[in-house]
Amino acid sequence: MHPHSSERETPHRWQAIAFYGKTRLFQLRRTVAEIGKRPLEHGKARALIDAPLMAEKRARLWRELSPEEFPLTAGKVENLRIAARAFHGLEIPPGEIMSFWRQLGRTTRRKGFLSGRELREGCIVPAIGGGLCQLSGLLYQVALAAGLEIIERHGHSRVVPGSQAEQDLDATIFWNYVDLRFRSHLPWRIEIELTTDELVVRLRGISGSRQQDPPAPSRLSPPRSLPSGDCLTCGMIECFRHPSAVKENAPALGHSAFLLDARWPEFDRWCAEHSRPGDRWFTPLDGNRWKKPNYQWTAPVGIAVRHATLAALRRSWNQRRLPAQGALRQQVLIEGEKEIARTYARMLHPQCRHVVVSQNLLPHLWRLGVLGGRSFDVLMERWPMEEMQRRLDQALAAHPQSTTLGDFRAEEELLQAEREALAAAARLITPHLALAAYFGPRAWIIPWEMPVPMPLRTSQGKPLLFFPASRLGRKGAFELADAMKSGISAELRYLGAADEGIADPFVGLYCSRGVKSDLASASALILPAWIEHQPRLALLALASGIPVIATEACGLPPHEKLYQIAAPDAVALAEMISSVLRPTLSTCVA
């Protein structure tokens, strides 16, 4: 028997019926009383996003939990995620009242709210939207700290041990008649954040807001202490609520979810090694069924795999109709990633405690708020967008004639979302050594998957230089062309049809478009890229013993056949090519 069960009377069904009828009468009375004079529903804005911080309060989301306690706590955190989306970014005009319920609306399953812990008539019971008092309590505390005028606030009638109710700093809510309302004579802004383990509430506003002393304690008599435990752990198995509570909230301790996009062999191996039975993998498509190698992730036995098939097919269809380069292509690609992320967000179970996410989906999931209250790792596939755009700007400054280096820049809100999400991530996982160096100790370096070596062929005539990319500025095409024009006696072959249009630097060079198999007869692979995220052909060349000349930005592993230059530079590149080709040229002369 639970140690507290003998201290309490067993709740009866008639009490619940009476409570239901009483609350409906109070709700009706509030609705009628406010006809024509309800507080306004406020909108989100960015006018005060840089305003001074007036107050900030934090509260723990999670505590040490038993499997029996976990489901309702996970439901509470999910309810807070939904509520945070409703309140974050609200800006309230001077003199206007902020009403908790007017802003959030009724908590229903249709809106995504789940069963959480709710204090009701001396019991902690499962209730749709349960746990939102943690948010209302923090809102009350920051309003007090910022000196806002409290219009309406109610304390709990029972005290949860260790809670803010012991200091009369709580604020209970119950649709719609038990509300929290406050206002200021100057404009102010609400910001809500769920970190891995905390709920954070901030108020921003114009300095000079009226300061108000905290109100006197609102309780006429000390609240009664609440016995510990909820419907799942209180020990009162004879209670009418107990059977349904146990049936609907099976003991659990959470699981991890892997939110994946295009397959990298390095990430596939890492995810398989770090999965456990009960975890879930989300992929765009069943790569084996659809014969799509880029989606052929290999989930271990015991892992549930789900797919965003319709979203992935729409993305694939849209990509086929896009030009090879340009702003339109990048915008459509981002929209496709956003749709995949939205689908994954709907599939995430509230009991998921940890997420592993492909980087391209990260900013969209962050903006959706589903990473709040969870720890997460990021599979780093590329430079952060902000850093990537900085590098493109640097390349454009060096080659202002380029038609591609400045064709697209992401919106600031997307950059900010990725910046915030990367800062909040637990681990940044990548095989790319340049990315790892950029993030320093936060990076978790995993080894590149080296390909099977290819059989080599001896070329006749001039040495063959292999450029494994299209003739684009970001791949170092301008630097390579200038290096070749400096007097290097070699044939150049490149991959891909995309180019710089009227600014094509390869015009006039002894070069031709090649195929992947041309690498087998190459004297060297050249990749002087400003940006290169997945240097697969360079890895194949190294594995096959072919010299590779590349920038550090390519992130390649140390190798005896790797010759690196610090950054794209035509002079340094020409010298390196000449040095690597010298033995080949000597052999040809002999």
Residue ranges of model-derived segments:
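Aromatic "clamp/platform" in nucleotide-sugar-dependent glycosyltransferases that forms part
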Residues: 530
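Membrane-proximal helix-turn-helix segments that form the acceptor-binding/catalytic region
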Residues: 339-347, 384, 397-427
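Donor nucleotide-sugar binding/catalytic pocket of nucleotide-sugar-dependent glycosyltransferases
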Residues: 407-456
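Conserved acidic donor-binding segment of nucleotide-sugar-dependent glycosyltransferases
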Residues: 562-571, 578-584
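Conserved donor-binding/catalytic core segment of Leloir-type glycosyltransferases
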Residues: 454-475, 481-485
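Short hydrophobic beta-strand element within catalytic cores of glycosyltransferases
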Residues: 547-550
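Acceptor-binding helix/loop patch of EC 2.4 sugar-transfer enzymes
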Residues: 316-327, 378-413
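N-terminal subdomain of nucleotide-sugar transferases
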Residues: 234-311, 485
